[in-house]
Amino acid sequence: MRELEEALRDWERYQRIPKKQFLQDRDTQNMVHHAMLLSIQSALDIATDVIAEERLRKPFTYRETFEVLAGEGIIPESLARDLSNLAGFRNVLVHIYWNLDLKQVYAILQHDLTVLRTFSVVMKEHVSESDSADPGGFF
């Protein structure tokens, strides 16, 4: 959880970068891409840890990871949809980085931090509840 929180603080700080600077400066783009990738990957890692710990159905794709949590009632369906979209974006960042739509990346930077913050809150609550029920529990 600590890794996610640190990455989200970076993401939040980078939201203050002016759009013009982001679109024109490759170093700024790389910095933002890295923070976004770490944030999304951290959320995926937390989700897969919960899936493994609770012996839930194994997802076939990163996008499906959050659907598994929603199917078990751990996160809301709407949050799972938004997180699945970010997982798809993560795949683009990793595999198609040379052909990114920078305006779309900037829009995600500005608007999707709340999705990951909500996930963090929900997962902290879930882990806390699980730890109460099973003191030998998570992370």
Q: What is the meaning of each model-derived region?
A:
Residues 1-139:
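Solvent-exposed interaction patches of small proteins and small membrane subunits
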